[in-house]
Structures are given as C-alpha cells and as structure tokens.
C-alpha cells in the first residue's frame, strides 16, 4: 500500500510501475485516487474553516451578552439580541455544514482506501520486467543436479514402498488435497521441521508458535484481496480466517505497535499448519503432496528499519540455500519478474529444488521484501533517533515446507535399491538412522 502523498506527487511513476506489472486496467485508479484525495483534503480544509468561524461566532456572543445585561434601552437591547440570535443561527448552520463535510470526508476516505489497497507497491529497480513467471530469471545454482542411472518413481510411489502415505483414506475422511503420513515418512516429515527450527534458532531467530487463526483486518493488512480470495478459508459466522502461512500471524503480532528502535530488527521463525484453497490452481504436479489444502511449514520473518531490508533480503534467501544444501538437495535461485510479484511485494525470489525424476527444478521456498506495504496497512512503526515516527519494513521467507521438501528429499536421496539415505544433519532427529529401508 502506497502513501497517498507519494501517489499525489508522483502519479506518472506510479502509473509506470503499474505498466511494468502488466496491470494496465488499474491505470485509471491513480487519477481516481488523486481526485478522491483532493476531495477529502478539501472537505477537511472547509471543515476547519467552518470550525474556526464557529468558534469566532461563539466567542463574539460573550461580549454581546455582557452588553445586553447592562443595556437599558429597549431598542438597543433588541438590536443586541438580534445579533446574538444571528450568531447562534450561523453557529447552528455551521454545525450542520460541518457534519455534512465530515460525512463527505469519510465517504471519500473509504473510497480512497479501497483504491489504495489495489494499487501495487513500487517494485525495486533490480526486478526483471515480464508479464508472468515464464519471465523469471535464474540467478545462480547451488549443487550439481543429479541424473540417476535408475528410474526415479513418483514421490507417492516412493512413500508407499515405506507404507508412508495413505491418500485414499484421507480422501474418504476429508476429500481431495489431504493425506495421512505414516511410519518413517511421518518421522522424516517431523525431523525436517525440527531440524529447520533448530537451524533458524542457530541463526539468531526467536522461535515462535503463533495463532493459527487471525482476524480479517490482519488478513487485509498482510495480503491483497485477490490473494485472500484465492487462498484463505474463513470460519463461518466468525471474524476469523485459517492462516495460509504463519507469516500472516507473525507479522500481525506487531499490528498498531511502535517498536523501540533498539529492539529492531525483530527476527522470528515459526512452525504452523497452513490451510489453503489453492489445490489445482496451477495445473502442475497435482497428484500427491505437491499442492494440497493442508500442510505444515517453518517460516521466517523480519521486521526492520527501511535501510536494513535489502541486507536482510539477501541474508534470508541464502539461509534457505544453506539449509537445502545441508540436506544434499541441489537448488537454484530464481528472480521473480514484475508480473509474477504479488501487489504488496517490491522484490521476491524463489528457491527451487532439483527433481531428478522430472529433470527440472520446482519451487520449495519464496523470499520476499514487502518494503513498508504491510507496515503501512498494519501501522507497524518505530521512532528514529530524532523522535520521528517511521514505518518499518517487513520480509518473509519459507524455511521449509515438508510436503514439497519431502519430494525433493526423497528423489535426491533415493538409492538404486529403493532405500533413502538420511543426511548426517537429520540423523539425530531420526533416532540415528543413516538409511531408510523400504518395507516392500
């Protein structure tokens, strides 16, 4: 969400940013926002002028009442009373006009706020320009992609060899997009989460278990209406939504807060279940656990001063690379182009893991710098050294989402005999096991 003052002073830059995001249908919104802002500011100015006039008239009656009390001439008394009555009538008229202006201001503000929620955040100058994810740019690779000399089965087929998944039972219980994990596969799922938690704690992040449901105003503060409609499950009859990622409730922790400058940055890592309506949204890898309604995830967020957000962005995606490489999974960094950026993001990259079965990379993490977009909506602020109130910047990144992580892990650590190697860093979380042996 942009500052209306910035939009007012830089309309062409805002329009150019919209063009770079290939959202030309939103171009008229810039002029509409400026017109509503002008209307709002005029209503405020007119209201202030009327308030001053009203105060002036009210004060003028004081001396008149004094004169009236002392006056003995009936004609003069009548004239004074007439002046007092005229002032009172003007005060009443001003009050009615002020109420009308207040209504006009509130209506303009409501319409303006609705538009401002739709105008996208200014993207960083380094973001590649393109209409969709086909224009995302590979930045660098980490680790050598593997090409096994044996056929790598589909991930659910690998899991079934360990009696590790039951999607049929989940379908009977919950419908499509759900699963039961069992045995060593379930242990592996939990081991990855526990390792990711300790990995981030080791990087200085504070571990957090957040609320799994949040109010609508928090949802509106952390994401666009389009993303909200596509992702979030609402609790019927309640002002509560199931979180699609713990980033939402972790960022929401700071709503309407003034954080002491010496307490920045705030660095949190959290575990949570995540709930999303997105099953089938992208038409890729729909079988199995790649795209599902419910999964668990370890997330990281940073709330910092504006001058520090670019540094944190670089650090955060590198944490993801380091974690995946410690699990013997080759990855690459993919810079998201302008058309692939959600409206609140000014810069984002995906970390993609190598799939030996498909012989291509697929997304496992997404790191984003949202600038002051979320902070402006949620009023997350700090006081600088001069005592001036400033908006914080917010960032988020997936540490690990085990459903997709499991796909990458199983494919990259699968052996020709059907067993799966357990990387050294995971063995303490797997009871010391060095290898998972299939049951059939």
Regions found by a protein language model. Give the residues of each.
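TRNA-recognition modules of translation machinery and tRNA-sensing kinases, especially anticodon-binding
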Residues: 27, 141-440
